[in-house]
């Protein structure tokens, strides 16, 4: 990776909350990240061959695991005073890691596993309900890192109050009901909006009434043209969402988790256009005109779109406008969305 691109990548993952990278400390230091590397100047030194243990450093070794004999070798080395071990398992992943987790925890040596995909990251952390102590995940984009964080349930988005400035009937249109394969809690919903940088938190249908039964797996998200977020942080059009698509579900604190879509339903319904303003940014959404579609208020309360008034405040995710190419954000590109 070219040096300039590497520094942008490191800055991006630092903004996502990553604190340690497997990288030469000279490169990691510029992004104010801790380094794990064979260099003695790393915070976490990976010993190679017969290299001596440097004083005042956390040290470990890297191992490939192909058999039980390799696991025994890891344990023997760990008992010599290693602070951590890095293991790379091949075809069999769960059983070897279960064996090492059980044994290494007794001698207080930390276990870091190599993962090859965001889904593997989550699996590594859930083994034996204890999980490994850390994962070394090869990522080429910030989106890869975001997706891994979503799998862990540690990804969050900044939500802020936005003031409703306009509400207007706009006739019939096609709206998308997203039925997820998850039971959604009160306060959870999807980020949806007509602009990629201004999205409303649209609540799920877990709240029933005397006329409707609860549908806690469903989000009546909005018109077909609207944006929502995929698990890598890139945008999707609601019209693209279908069985098997993975979308982000957020709570009122901005904490995100992934949800698989069981089906989406596109139906023609009367629609409302709603606009709001937050920190000088103005965004809108076209949602079905029905009592069951709710936004989330600051503090976690709910308000139906049919009861909204100018001046009301609802939670949105807003940031300065940026261009997008096939859903991926493009920095420094001029764009004006209305």
Swiss-Prot record:
One of its GO terms (biological process) is amino acid biosynthetic process. It catalyses: 2-amino-2,3,7-trideoxy-D-lyxo-hept-6-ulosonate + NAD(+) + H2O = 3-dehydroquinate + NH4(+) + NADH + H(+). Keywords: Amino-acid biosynthesis, Aromatic amino acid biosynthesis, NAD, Oxidoreductase. Its EC number is 1.4.1.24. The keyword DNA repair does not apply. The keyword Glycosyltransferase does not apply. It comes from the Archaea. One of its GO terms (molecular function) is 3-dehydroquinate synthase activity. HAMAP family: Arch_DHQ_synthase (MF_01244). Catalyzes the oxidative deamination and cyclization of 2-amino-3,7-dideoxy-D-threo-hept-6-ulosonic acid (ADH) to yield 3-dehydroquinate (DHQ), which is fed into the canonical shikimic pathway of aromatic amino acid biosynthesis. Belongs to the archaeal-type DHQ synthase family. This is 3-dehydroquinate synthase.
């Amino acid at each position: 990776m070219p040096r300039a691109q590497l520094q942008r990548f490191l800055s991006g993952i630092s903004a996502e909350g990553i604190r340690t990278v497997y990288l030469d400390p000279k490169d990691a230091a510029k992004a104010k990240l801790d380094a794990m590397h064979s260099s003695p100047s790393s915070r976490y030194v990976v010993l190679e061959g017969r290299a001596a243990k440097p004083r005042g450093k956390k040290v470990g070794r890297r191992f490939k695991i192909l058999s039980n004999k390799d696991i025994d070798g890891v344990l023997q080395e760990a008992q010599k005073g290693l602070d951590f071990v890095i293991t790379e398992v091949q075809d069999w992943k769960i059983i070897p890691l279960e064996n090492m987790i059980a044994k290494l925890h007794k001698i207080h040596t930390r276990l870091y596993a190599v993962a090859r995909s965001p889904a593997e990251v989550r699996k590594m952390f859930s083994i034996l309900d204890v999980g490994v102590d850390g994962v070394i995940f090869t990522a080429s984009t910030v989106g890869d890192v975001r997706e891994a964080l979503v799998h862990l349930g540690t990804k969050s988005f900044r939500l802020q109050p936005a003031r409703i400035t306009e509400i207007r009937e706009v006739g019939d249109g096609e709206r998308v009901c997203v039925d997820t394969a998850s039971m959604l809690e009160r306060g959870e919903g999807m980020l949806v909006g007509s602009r990629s940088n201004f999205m409303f938190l649209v609540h799920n249908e877990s709240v029933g009434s005397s006329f409707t039964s609860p549908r806690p797996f469903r989000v009546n998200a909005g018109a077909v043209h609207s944006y929502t977020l995929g698990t890598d942080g890139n945008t999707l059009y609601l019209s693209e969402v279908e069985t098997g698509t993975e979308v982000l579900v957020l709570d009122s604190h901005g904490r995100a988790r992934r949800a698989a879509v069981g089906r989406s339903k596109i139906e023609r319904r009367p629609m409302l256009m709603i606009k709001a303003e937050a920190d000088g940014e103005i965004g809108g959404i076209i949602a079905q005109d029905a009592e069951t579609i709710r936004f989330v208020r600051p503090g976690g309360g709910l308000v139906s779109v049919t009861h909204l008034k100018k001046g009301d405040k609802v939670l949105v995710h807003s940031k300065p406008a940026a261009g997008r190419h096939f859903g991926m954000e493009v920095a420094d590109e001029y764009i004006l969305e209305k």
